[in-house]
Swiss-Prot record:
Family per similarity comment: Belongs to the acetaldehyde dehydrogenase family.
Catalytic class of the enzyme: oxidoreductase
Protein name: Acetaldehyde dehydrogenase 2
Disulfide topology: none
MF terms (GO), sorted A to Z: acetaldehyde dehydrogenase (acetylating) activity; NAD binding
Classification via InterPro entries: Acetaldehyde_dehydrogenase, Acetylaldehyde_DH_C, NAD(P)-bd_dom_sf, Semialdehyde_DH_NAD-bd
Positions contributing to NAD(+) binding: S12, G13, N14, I15, S163, A164, G165, P166, G167, T168, R169, A170, N171, N282
GO biological process per UniProt: catabolic process
Amino acid sequence: MPEKLQVAIVGSGNISTDLLYKLQRSEYLEPRWMIGIDPESEGLARARKLGLETSHEGVDWLLAQDDKPDLVFEATSAYVHRAAAPRYEEAGIRAIDLTPAAVGPAVIPPANLREHLDAPNVNMITCGGQATIPIVYAVTRAVTEQGGTVPYAEIVASVSSSSAGPGTRANIDEFTKTTSKGVQTIGGAARGKAIIILNPADPPMIMRDTIFCAIPEDADRDAIAQSIRDVVAEVQTYVPGYRLLNDPQFDDPSINSGGQAVVTTFVEVEGAGDYLPPYAGNLDIMTAAAAKVGEEIAKESLSLAGGAQA
């Protein structure tokens, strides 16, 4: 077993290129291939300069090679990944899906990564999901420990219009559906809603998110606030630019909140600037979270194979 898992990146756009720079720093992942469909792609050109094997002939080319990757990161679009996913599985290649296709279980690193380290295909949900579902999870965790529930959570993700390429715009419907589902199934809210705003401001604004969670009126607010701070610190281990804008705000039940107590959390995400500009935190958190998931999968796989310590 090699000391690193051999990795292919499928897709050659902005997200794939930023992901490549992050994977190059990994102790457990070795990016060897980048696959696209545009021979003039800047992503493929950059990958070639960095020594990767590249092709503009898509997944067909990759799967025709004698030497195949252990792990694929796919950053194309939902419909493309839905078609490719069964082919990866048939070839014995594990996949980390950065599209909203949701073929495999959805993963938010602070919430449920350990549960899915052996899954053949995992989904990174959406940029808004990676930024906001950890907060919903933090609130639900604290409330559940007190014997309560979170009946409703709503997230609003505001991202720079400049950071939203054609893939993001084409996937808006999938974004809202996939993120809303994740707010419930991973965040733990009984009902969830997701809204994305493309901010046209110039100069571009960094990603900012608002998370509303309904909570029991008698919930321990200090415990909820501490749970939120703990999860933010965990996200910061792989997204250093992830931060609270201020302390969580608690409001008593009112007509405006449907008669429920509410905690509101404001976060912003500044990108690391590996390839994408720092204001594109919405894209950076996707690539950083995907790299985190890939590293943990690799640690587990290499440890089980005796190739490295977990």
